[in-house]
Amino acid sequence: MNEPLASKKIRWKCRRGMLELDILLERFYEEKFRSLTKNEKEIFNQLLDQPDPLLYDWLLGHVTPESSEFKKIIRKIQQLSS
């Protein structure tokens, strides 16, 4: 898949069923996605495959993801929103 198409699909995946997640994820995408490494972009894409309630808990710090890669991206999203 080419980069612009993949990027558009990831942007679309930032749209969730919860307004709070939409705000956090879309802002992160708009402000930080381009500066991520290729690996971080892949991890962010995998993060977006997770269910909304779990993402919500991770982003608000109620639960910590087991994956160290997810933890790094979650921290970046949290830093942007603080």
Swiss-Prot record:
Pfam families: Sdh5. InterPro entries: SDH, SDH_sf, SdhE_FAD_assembly_factor. It is found in: Cytoplasm. Its main location: cytoplasm. This is FAD assembly factor SdhE. Belongs to the SdhE FAD assembly factor family. It comes from Coxiella burnetii (strain RSA 493 / Nine Mile phase I). The gene is sdhE. GO terms for cellular component: cytoplasm. Keywords: Chaperone, Cytoplasm. GO terms for biological process: succinate metabolic process. PANTHER family: FAD ASSEMBLY FACTOR SDHE. An FAD assembly protein, which accelerates covalent attachment of the cofactor into other proteins. Plays an essential role in the assembly of succinate dehydrogenase (SDH, respiratory complex II), an enzyme complex that is a component of both the tricarboxylic acid cycle and the electron transport chain, and which couples the oxidation of succinate to fumarate with the reduction of ubiquinone (coenzyme Q) to ubiquinol. Required for flavinylation (covalent attachment of FAD) of the flavoprotein subunit SdhA of SDH and other flavinylated proteins as well.
